[in-house]
Amino acid sequence: MQNEVQQALAAFSARYCEAWRQQRGSLPVSEEYIGISSPCIVSTHPDAVEWEPQPFTPEDSLGAVEKALDIVIQPDVHAFYASQYAGDMAARYDDVALTLLQAWSQDDFRRVQENLIGHLVTQKRLKLSPTIFIATLDSELDVISLCNLTGEVVQETLGTRKRRVLAPSLSTFLSQLTPLV
């Protein structure tokens, strides 16, 4: 049975794919995934792949991140990163344009975990409260993250205490995203 985050992520992913169908007449197409295998690939073209989200199998979690840093990560983040394989998806939340990060494959999921470990180690070194990034912004210094203490979704400037709460929960945040094609 899916939890709220998995349901909200699946619903946004469906809206994203439908927006592609309506505006471009196809499933999402990405140039950056050419030559990288994934269960998401529906068809390969000379300069891009057409893809759609697929269930995350085998079941997994961010346990490696928890073990490496001896912390407990919010269950919502496990559900976000380990419920589906998909390409990164462009979206808007209120006035904020963002790219929602996803794991493209099992290898990519391992890379995501390594990046999360690096992010959390840096935060610990700087004595910042822990966050788990879930989306990027045009500015390379700003990301959208889930606060691991409160469960709130925040826009933060990396390496600083500058944070702005966007949503009270990850499921609320995901349900209010508008796909950008």
UniProtKB/Swiss-Prot annotation:
Keywords: Cell inner membrane, Cell membrane, Membrane
Topology class, membrane: Peripheral membrane protein
Subcellular location(s) of the protein: Cell inner membrane
Record's keyword annotation contains Cell membrane: yes
Residues passing through the membrane, by range: none
Primary site of residence: membrane
GO annotations of cellular component type: cytoplasmic side of plasma membrane
Domain of life, source organism: Bacteria
Family under the similarity heading: Belongs to the Syd family.
Function: Interacts with the SecY protein in vivo. May bind preferentially to an uncomplexed state of SecY, thus functioning either as a chelating agent for excess SecY in the cell or as a regulatory factor that negatively controls the translocase function.
Full protein name: Protein Syd
UniProt organism field: Cronobacter sakazakii (strain ATCC BAA-894) (Enterobacter sakazakii)
Gene name of the record: syd
